[in-house]
């Protein structure tokens, strides 16, 4: 819908009833109590597959093929295809300046040179990627993802390719179909380069199932102690280290926003249900969110538009407002040469967000100053909702644990060794009572009600210091870079948005990235050490002779679990 006076498309948050999202969240909690989460091949993953071996039909989405999706590469990046954003690579492919196989090969060359250091992937599908690139070169053009190499977190089903979730439980599972999100990306022309490392069962930073640290932060590849973020660690390192154009992860408690902030990326956790969870190894029915990790707001918008939409295989995705024009939202708006906000926007600033003398606080203050200088952007102080610390604290946050333990109970009863280093949090979930879970669901609805009434009555988006509150209630978040520490480690921040209105925070980040260059910066390459190990799964890699990067204990994983 457009504004009758200006002809400008309205943001989705101006058209929606926020209370309807509250009612839907309550219904989702009730559905979760019935027990609707199913593990792949629950009777025995080594030999059993899901009873339904066909993925839902997915068709090409022409809405992605918009003029705003294409940008000619920057002069400084013209000579290196792996420096291009999706929109830049798409411009080059669309104008016949490069063919998909050349782009894929450029990334495979970097994987050959640097993957042994980064350890971003569980498996690299080099031959399949080159074959797909050649096929796309001879097919009708599909839009900005046509021929784009992508990294897929290893909890997304990939037909005929092991999907381990970095767990002993799934080490022999080979899905018979793709996850809906993977299918949607491939239908749009995306090319799967490989499956990426992750925290075991999507818990913490990427490690082997036994806790041995694998993936490093691309900005400090020789220092494995630098936090790379988790659990979508491998996807973040692959995109930041220029081993893939973009990638996808999942978030239950910061698993997209944390690695995005840690590695100078722009990542989106969309509204609950905006992207289908069908074909993803689950954690919780009410808090799992698939989403993209990308290099800038435009790329994140392209990826999310491809992934989003209703799916018959996931009731959470049905009956939602239509996906807004995210690509336009992520395109900076200019009046002549003057940048303006796409829509008049109030950015809510919570108490203490930029206080103190830390490098992070200084970067936050600089971010707020940049935004306040953009016409039609207003900074608004907003209070914490009533009982914020209680409602967002560990007591209620931990009620997610029994929900995720429930579908794993057959494994918990039979052999705890299959859970490896992540076993503690699964046992915690199994031991928490139903009363606590029900109380937690009531607390979640109260928290959501207060966020909608006491924060979003005064602002359109809100800055955050932690992803947890909006993870609990299922509201959208976007993480993006705002600076660097003195040691050269990225500093990021998070914006939270209103239900289904991913367009508004995307427009804010696009405006900010139009006046800053943090998102353009890339880490220096590590020393090239030759071809990566041939081990194709987490289980195989655990026996490979690689230098130790330390090991997380079960207690540490329980403390850090996402």
Predicted feature descriptions by range:
Residues 91-95, 108-119, 134, 138, ...:
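Sec-exported extracytoplasmic/periplasmic mature domains
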Residues 24-171, 201-204, 319, 524-562:
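Short, well-ordered alpha-helical
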Residues 66-72, 269-362, 516-535, 553:
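A short helix-breaking turn/cap at a secondary-structure junction
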Residues 77, 146-165, 341-350, 391-445, ...:
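Short helix-loop capping/hinge segments that flank enzyme active sites or metal/cofactor-binding pockets
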Residues 1-20:
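N-terminal secretory signal peptides
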Residues 97-105, 134, 356-385, 405-415, ...:
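Acyltransferase
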Residues 96, 147, 187, 191, ...:
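Glycine-rich, small-residue loops and helix-cap segments
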Residues 146-290, 315-319:
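Short glycine/serine-rich loop/turn segments
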